[in-house]
């Protein structure tokens, strides 16, 4: 079976997933590919492990940005692909191989058939953490080429190929990591009265955290606290001196994020007093909500609805986190879901997006940026 050039690129990238700010092979792959393109109208910069590319327009009055994230996840792949990850314990399980490939496809199309306006492509590292969008946005490398508008996409396993799903306004939630370390006093299991058991303290803390959302967030708003990992103790007959909770917070409103964190801190202070222990809270990486510019999103959806190869869906907001929200906070633009029809979802070891979505997305986005970038 013959596959397209860009499907092959996706397969190449799929084999070399790398974690945040470690995407050296991916960066080099992108740079090597760019060297194959006509270069008289291209300028290239590197930023950490990312790549920024400017395609100079024929008669520019504005700059249109396209952002593609590059990093993978610490997941052991179970797809059965012949082109599965060659990096042990790492996988492109969130579609960033698709995102980067589509970006390279759009770059190729616009280099070979330039539009009037300038285009800037942001191949961004570390979306999965610790977060690359905000520092890239604030970097000296981007200041000179900062777009006037920007767009990005994310694959959506639940939608069929040919589907574009988005909405005006809030699309993705505010998110924050959550790490809580408890330290008490260890001891022999036979003498619990001489120790402060951090397994018990952690258990009480998990239970009490369940009240934060149900009793402190407006039922008409949405928020989630999930504790996904608990560690503590060393062996079965020693009372644990330390324990650690790892989780995530997600809220639709900025106000709810502050309220949730205030309540978490109050509950943790109560645990410290009740169990005579010390606690440290770390919120890790925090991502701003993805808020689509209303007018640009409406215009984009109207344009897409005229394409007979695309089905446009107005979706609901999701509790998904995306550091692209920082870019949209500073630059008007939007993000949309791209249907890839996979039985397994994002962050799953068996995620298998339909590669037919790649060339269709490139063709559609090329038509959109031509239309948008040639308007006066």
From Swiss-Prot:
Keywords: Amino-acid biosynthesis, Diaminopimelate biosynthesis, Hydrolase, Lysine biosynthesis
Keyword presence, Ribosomal protein: no
InterPro entries given in the database record: AcetylDAP_deacetylase, Amidohydrolase, Bact_exopeptidase_dim_dom, Peptidase_M20, Peptidase_M20_dimer
Active site (UniProt): 69, 128
E.C. no: 3.5.1.47
GO biological process assignments: diaminopimelate biosynthetic process; lysine biosynthetic process via diaminopimelate
Pfam families: M20_dimer (PF07687), Peptidase_M20 (PF01546)
Similarity comment: Belongs to the peptidase M20A family. N-acetyldiaminopimelate deacetylase subfamily.
Chain's role: Catalyzes the conversion of N-acetyl-diaminopimelate to diaminopimelate and acetate.
Name of this protein: N-acetyldiaminopimelate deacetylase
């Amino acid at each position: 079976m013959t596959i397209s050039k860009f499907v092959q690129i996706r397969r190449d990238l799929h084999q070399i997933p790398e974690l945040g700010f470690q995407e050296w092979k991916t960066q080099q792959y992108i740079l090597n590919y760019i060297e194959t393109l006509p270069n008289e109208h291209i300028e290239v910069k590197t930023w950490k492990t990312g790549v920024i590319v400017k395609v100079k327009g024929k008669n520019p009055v504005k700059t249109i940005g396209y952002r593609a994230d590059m990093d993978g996840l610490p997941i052991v792949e179970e797809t059965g692909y012949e082109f599965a990850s060659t990096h042990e314990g790492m996988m492109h399980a969130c579609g960033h191989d698709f995102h980067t490939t589509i970006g390279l496809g759009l770059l190729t199309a616009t280099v070979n058939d330039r539009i009037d306006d300038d285009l800037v492509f942001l191949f961004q590292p570390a979306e999965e953490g610790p977060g690359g969008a905000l520092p890239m946005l604030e970097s000296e490398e981007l200041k000179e080429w900062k777009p006037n508008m920007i767009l990005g996409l994310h694959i959506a396993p639940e939608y069929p190929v040919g589907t574009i799903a988005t909405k005006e306004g809030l699309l993705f939630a505010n998110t924050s990591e959550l790490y809580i370390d408890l330290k008490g006093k260890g001891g022999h299991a036979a003498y619990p009265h001489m120790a402060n058991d951090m397994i018990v303290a952690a258990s009480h803390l998990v239970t009490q955290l369940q009240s934060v959302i149900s009793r402190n967030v407006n039922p008409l708003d949405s928020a989630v606290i999930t504790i996904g990992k608990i560690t503590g103790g060393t062996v079965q007959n020693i009372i644990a001196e330390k324990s650690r909770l790892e989780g995530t917070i997600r809220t639709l409103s900025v106000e709810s994020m502050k309220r949730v964190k205030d309540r978490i801190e109050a509950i943790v202070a109560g645990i410290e007093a009740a169990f005579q222990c010390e606690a440290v809270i770390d919120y890790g990486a925090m991502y701003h909500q993805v808020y689509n510019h209303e007018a640009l999103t409406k215009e984009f959806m109207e344009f897409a609805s005229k394409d007979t190869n695309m089905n446009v869906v107005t979706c609901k907001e999701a509790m998904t986190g995306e550091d692209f929200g920082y870019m949209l906070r500073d630059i008007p633009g939007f993000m949309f879901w791209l249907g890839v029809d996979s039985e397994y979802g994002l962050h799953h070891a068996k995620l298998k997006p339909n590669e037919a979505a790649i060339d269709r997305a490139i063709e559609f986005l090329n038509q959109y940026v031509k239309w948008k970038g040639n308007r006066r």
